[in-house]
Amino acid sequence: MSDSLSARLEAAVSALPVRFPGPGGAVAVVKDGEVLVRHTWGYANAERRLPFTPSSLFRMCSITKQFTCGVLLDLFQDPAELDGDVDDRLPQLDEPAPGALHLAHNQSGLRDYWAVAMLHGAPVEGFFGDREGRRVIDGTRTLQFQPGTSYSYVNQNFRLLSDILEDRTGRNFAELLQTSIFNPVGMERAILAAETRAMPDGTVGYEGTVESGFRPAVNNIWWTGDAGLGASLDDMIAWERFIDATRDDPDGLYNRLTTPVTFRDGEAAPYGFGLQRTSLFGRDVTMHGGALRGWRSHRLHVASERLSVVVMFNHMSPAQVAAGQILAAALGVPYEPHRPTQPPHDLYGTFLARETGLSARTEPAPRGATLRLLLVPDMTD
């Protein structure tokens, strides 16, 4: 590593705890298969004074999705073999069911099951396990759009895949991850941590701010193939090094995961096999983030540079922004986040519907405005 690269990375990494304050965090940079940065700080559990270390287990949340697709591709050369299984799991659907690849590419047309449960009145902090998930999925009658024609981020696409893989193989998903991913990659501490209330080593996710203080986040969701991965920084480093080591193998797992994906009309899709496909600083990037109350993570890979970045926060700071800053430092380019230039508008703000308890937030965007719909928790006196 050159002196200039070392200095840029050291400055960017040392700034993370200041720019993104919270109980703890971790960051790694892998270049040409070599680990340039492996750094942790703060506490994995502030109450017990457990330090955040490279071996601390972390709730990776939706980064799980690429690993679920990795198991899928490892076990089935043609995932379309599972199309009938998808249909069987949507017994009340009144139209043709999506196929397995539609699930893997977030092109299924399904509506997110946890969001649907909240809209039906389920409490945000209530228990949402296997029974609750199956009830929502089994009740699906219609789709948002015809499969393969559009994109919508839906967690149960990957829950369905992991459930189907379990049924097809007769093995639980934790075992499938172990044999298809963790063992070959060398992810020695990685586990399926489906129950989100606690991590087995005591690592805690926090919500709050420096001004208000941080408190342990409350989660009662049961994630599997959609967001159940528990992994350490060292486990994620092993994944990035595996990606680099297999880069020249056309049948290598990550090469298969990052093969170009299109919609039905042939237009390139921005998401496939549990990975976002985008461009940062003029380079093609595959990446994904993870988020749950108290947890934020982000990993990205720039194949043309043989470069990977991993960021993990056990608090709710934007890990994707931190990863972008580290990537910019590694590439030696300025980090210039987009700042909307539209003039103030009366429509910008948050609006509440009293009848439904839903809120809509409008804010500036590069070509106009974005609309975000959020569920507002009930307030008690």
Language-model segment annotations:
Residues D3, R19-G25, K31-E34, Y43-N155, ...:
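Active-site-proximal loop and beta-strand segments within enzyme catalytic domains
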Residues M1-T40, E166-D167, R171, E175-T179, ...:
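Catalytic loop of the DD-peptidase/beta-lactamase superfamily, centered on the K-T-G motif
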Residues R8-A12, D85, L160:
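Short, conserved clusters of charged catalytic residues that mark active-site
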Residues L110, F158, H315-S317:
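Solvent-exposed loop/turn segments at secondary-structure junctions
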